[in-house]
Amino acid sequence: MSLTRLLIRDFRNIETADLALSPGFNFLVGANGSGKTSVLEAIYTLGHGRAFRSLQIGRVIRHEQEAFVLHGRLQGEERETAIGLTKDKQGDSKVRIDGTDGHKVAELAHLMPMQLITPEGFTLLNGGPKYRRAFLDWACFHNEPGFFTAWSNLKRLLKQRNAALRQVTRYEQLRPWDKELIPLAEQISTWRAEYSAGIAADMADTCKQFLPEFSLTFSFQRGWEKETEYAEVLERNFERDRLLTYTAHGPHKADLRIRADGAPVEDTLSRGQLKLLMCALRLAQGEFLTRESGRRCLYLIDDFASELDDERRGLLASRLKATQSQVFVSAISAEHVIDMSDENSKMFTVEKGKITD
């Protein structure tokens, strides 16, 4: 599915824009601060309900306006889908799909699987386990119909359990929460483990292309001891959890550990190499989704030329073209992306929030 039309109103520094898009490569060229990243962020927000540069809604809505409005048209193989998102300064959202209100942001996310590559995206590799859990959970969300409900219930139960830990004195008082929590934790961990095992070879092969000088390994850690039942872990660690007032073990502590030549990648790779690894992982994940489900990602790439030499830029471009996916690329100069352009691509110029093609 590709985004054929994008309407933006009062988002960041963009007052209004109406863009007809290519199903292939779309280039956004402009100086720093021109608004090219804001276009990428508008697309991301339309599919996620939140921006990727700021969680504060007031910074995303254009100055002195009350709300932003985003609309898009998605073209699938058999039908077109109209989608829309409005969000005001209070954080209240309205999601519209095919002319009807009352939809959830998760429905937009399901319609628009995306891979985001930004200069800030190093957090996937050096920002702690929660970013790698998000990497795994993105895939589980798009591959397992029951994942989102299970994940939402898990978060709710963990919050309730942590609150209860401040009040209880005996483990038996926690059993009502743990009775619900344990099967959810085990199911989510199973989904994550199955996905990690399934994509491991793809990640290794793609990383080998981008970083042939390193031997990269990937290891899923579920968040509690291997070969131990989660029920046993919760009961055994009750006193420790009660002192900490939070649940110290579980799927909320899971990680995907990535090592280069046996050492953590954040301690081994340069910034340029970390960006290559990030690109490789995002690409592998998108390709895996297509192979498993037939669905294609949208790829959003901010500041394409940053920290990549000509050879690696060419490699990334050729791999992206091979996916036959829709790609949005921002760059300071058209020279950085001209060799990626073909007869089906579109080049947009962005200047002070105004977008022309």
UniProtKB/Swiss-Prot annotation:
Ligand binding (ATP): G30, A31, N32, G33, S34, G35, K36, T37
Organism domain of life: Bacteria
Subcellular location: Cytoplasm
GO molecular function: ATP binding; single-stranded DNA binding
UniProt GO cellular component terms: cytoplasm
UniProt keyword list: ATP-binding, Cytoplasm, DNA damage, DNA repair, DNA replication, DNA-binding, Nucleotide-binding, SOS response
One Pfam family matching this protein: SMC_N
Keyword Transmembrane helix: no
SUPFAM superfamilies in the record: P-loop containing nucleoside triphosphate hydrolases
Main function: The RecF protein is involved in DNA metabolism; it is required for DNA replication and normal SOS inducibility. RecF binds preferentially to single-stranded, linear DNA. It also seems to bind ATP.
NCBIfam families recorded: recf
Annotated protein name in UniProt: DNA replication and repair protein RecF
